[in-house]
Each structure stands twice: as structure tokens, then as C-alpha cells.
Curated annotation (Swiss-Prot):
Xref: HAMAP family: NdpA
Residues in the signal sequence: none
Recorded family membership: Belongs to the YejK family.
GO CC terms in record: bacterial nucleoid; cytoplasm
Pfam families per the UniProt record, alphabetical: NA37 (PF04245)
Protein name, entry field: Nucleoid-associated protein plu2870
Compartments, as annotated in UniProt: Cytoplasm, Nucleoid
InterPro entries given in the database record: Nucleoid_associated_NdpA
Segments crossing the lipid bilayer: none
GO molecular function, one term: double-stranded DNA binding
Keywords, in A-Z order: Cytoplasm
Length: 334
């Protein structure tokens, strides 16, 4: 992994009681050794694999202003991180889920892109066995379950300040509260919505198929091609690029897919992250509610599975063997 750490600082937030969240500030930057490199590689991997929300700084963002000064050399990275940690404490203390933790600020490069990552990491206790086969207690950072993390694409921010996607943050296990916390701390507003972009892509695909007057099988084959490209990008950790997608798809009429989507004003970005749950709709139908969960391949619709909109009735011809076995057992009273 070509990850190069430029500067990294650690501080700590300690919850003394329900009303007090203390801050402990480090007096020097963390030395970059193999342990630190391994930790950042793991944190980068975990962060990259999780679902993220996008944002951009508000004009009055204190963090953005402080970061600009730090980037210009008016303040060193340690001083920037110490002041930011104090602001972080003030914002986090407003929320009932505040538990403290290790605060990490890391400026690093990955694949020619410069990032600033900010995280609050929880610590966990575990046990290890030493050479004498005795048990020892160990304390470790719970990086795999990190959910209070934000990252600024410094390269994008400085070269394209009008961008709506240079700032990302995790949605977190406590949902909207974490989003609110990061918005307050960063003084940022919501930017590009990846799920909306993916939904727009699906609508554009359906409309393009309709313009090409494709039959049912042809439409599903086209959707499958779109899904294959998008899934490959997702697995590779790359974004969906409309131009590349268009080049991989057949053209109907005088316009290729990219030209069609631009003319119809779907407001699709040139590239955007793939959203797994949305893209799955290209090849599957799925839904749940009222104690019922249904999931089936789209190609079965109209062949083995039929829907009557007048009565809202779904008819399935041929059930899976394991389901059929359960139904037979229950019907016979076993």
C-alpha cells in the first residue's frame, strides 16, 4: 500500500462523569514507525470500505480557516491538532453518546492524493497468552469498529474549492447523531449524495432502454451490463465514471448513454461512489415489512413471479426446495 504519513498527532478525551469531558493534549507529534504505519494502513482500509456521507465547509468554518493557516505554514500541525481537539471536545460534549476516546489527526498521502483524517477511536480490553502460557490483559484501539471518523481530501479542496465532495464522514452506528456531530465540529453542510446519484443512474438506464425500445429480455441484459461495470468498480474501490460506463455499453440511436444522460439533465456527476444497496436493484427485487421478506432475481419477474397491481398480489410459481420442505412440514402438522 503506497500510504505515506506526513504528520500524525494523538490526543485524548476522557469522560470523567456525565457532565465532564476532559481533554489531554500531547506535547509532540507521534514518531512514524512501523507500528504507526500499520495502524494508519488499517484505519485507511477500514474507512475506505465503509459507507460515507459527503460534505463541504461552510464559509464560517473555524476548522477550515485554521486548516488554511496550517497549510500556509502560519501554524504547525501539532498546534492545529491541539486547538481542533479542544473544539472537538466542546462539540462532542453536547451529545449524550459522548464517550471520549483517542483523538487522531493524520496528514498522509495515498496514490498522489493528500488527506487529513480526523478520528475518535475507542479502546477495548482483551487478553493475550505469553510465552509462559499465562494470560495477560491487553488494551487496544478498536479500529475495525471506528465510526467517528472524518476525512478531508486536501488535494481536491485546494485545487477545486467549489467541489461538494472533498469532505467525507462515516454515518456511524448511532445514525444521524454522528452526522450532526461532524457537521457541527467541521462547520460543514451536506454535499454530494452518493445514494441519490446511484438512483439517478438507475433512472437514466431505464429511460435509455425505453428510448431504445428494448424488449423485456434486452432491458434486463442491459441492466446486467450496467451492474457488472458498477460492481467491478465497487469491488476495486473505484468510483463509477459515466464516460467509461457509456463506452462499455451498446449505443441506441444517435446518442450514447453519456450523451443521453447529459441531455435529459439527470444531474449526474462525472464520477461518484457506487452504492451497493441501490445498484442491487438493477438485478434483483427486494423488500420487507409486516413480517415478510422477499428477494428474487429480476429475470424471474413475469416468468415465475407475477404481480397483480389491482389486488397487490404476488404469485410465485415454483418455490425453493428448502422453503417447500418447511411448508409441507407445517401443513402436515409436524
Amino acid at each position: 500500500m503506497s500510504l505515506q504519513i506526513d504528520q500524525i498527532a494523538l490526543h485524548q478525551l476522557i469522560k470523567r462523569d456525565e457532565q465532564t469531558l476532559d481533554v489531554v493534549l500531547r506535547d509532540s507529534l507521534l514518531a512514524t514507525d512501523q507500528v504507526v504505519e500499520d495502524m494508519m494502513a488499517e484505519l485507511h482500509r477500514v474507512y475506505s470500505a465503509k459507507s460515507k456521507a459527503y460534505g463541504l465547509f461552510n464559509e464560517e468554518s473555524e476548522l477550515a480557516e485554521a486548516l488554511r493557516h496550517q497549510r500556509k505554514g502560519d501554524e504547525d500541525f501539532l498546534g492545529f491538532s491541539r486547538a481542533a481537539t479542544a473544539r472537538l471536545r466542546d462539540e462532542l460534549a453536547k451529545y449524550p453518546f459522548a464517550e471520549g476516546g483517542t483523538v487522531l489527526f493524520c496528514q498522509y498521502r495515498y496514490l498522489a492524493v493528500e488527506y487529513l483524517l480526523i478520528a475518535v477511536l475507542n479502546s477495548c480490553n482483551s487478553m493475550s497468552v505469553n510465552d509462559n502460557l499465562d494470560l495477560n490483559t491487553t488494551h487496544y484501539l478498536d479500529i475495525p469498529h471506528a465510526d467517528i471518523v472524518a476525512r478531508i481530501d486536501l488535494t481536491e479542496w485546494e485545487t477545486n474549492p467549489e467541489s461538494s465532495r472533498y469532505l467525507t464522514f462515516l454515518k456511524g452506528r448511532v445514525g444521524r447523531k454522528v452526522s450532526d456531530f461532524f457537521m457541527d465540529f467541521l462547520a460543514a453542510s451536506e454535499g454530494m449524495n452518493a445514494k441519490v446519484q446511484n438512483k439517478g443512474l438507475l433512472q437514466a438506464v431505464d429511460d435509455y432502454c425505453e428510448s431504445g425500445e428494448l424488449n423485456k429480455d434486452e432491458r434486463q441484459a442491459y441492466r446486467q451490463q450496467v451492474y457488472n461495470y458498477c460492481n467491478e468498480q465497487l469491488q476495486a474501490g473505484e468510483e463509477i465514471e459515466i464516460k467509461a460506463l457509456s463506452q462499455a455499453l451498446p449505443t441506441f440511436g444517435e446518442q450514447n448513454f453519456q450523451q443521453f444522460s447529459q441531455e435529459q439533465e439527470y444531474e449526474l456527476e462525472e464520477s461518484f461512489p457506487a452504492d451497493r444497496s441501490t445498484l442491487r436493484q438493477l438485478t434483483k427485487f427486494a423488500g420487507s415489512g409486516g413480517g415478510l421478506t422477499i428477494n428474487f432475481d429480476a429475470m424471474l419477474f413475469g416468468e415465475r413471479i407475477f404481480w397483480d397491481p389491482a389486488t397487490d398480489t404476488l404469485t410465485i410459481k415454483g418455490t425453493p426446495p428448502n422453503l417447500r420442505d418447511q411448508l409441507q412440514r407445517r401443513s402436515s402438522g409436524h
